[in-house]
Amino acid sequence: MKIRNSLKSLKGRHRDNRVIRRRGRTYIINKTVRRFKARQG
């Protein structure tokens, strides 16, 4: 999982990317290509 300051550019890298908010953190998850996972930090 990558940890990035800004997730806006990562969101557009694949059409299946989803922005999810869990426990106050913002994540990008992708069910089909799992290497696109990221967390804002």
UniProtKB/Swiss-Prot annotation:
The leader peptide range reads: none
A cellular component term, taken from the record's GO annotations: ribosome
What are the entry keywords? Ribonucleoprotein, Ribosomal protein
Q: Does the keyword Ribonucleoprotein apply?
A: yes
Q: Which Pfam families match?
A: Ribosomal_L36
Q: Which HAMAP family match?
A: Ribosomal_bL36
Kindly provide the name given to this protein in its UniProt entry. Answer: Large ribosomal subunit protein bL36
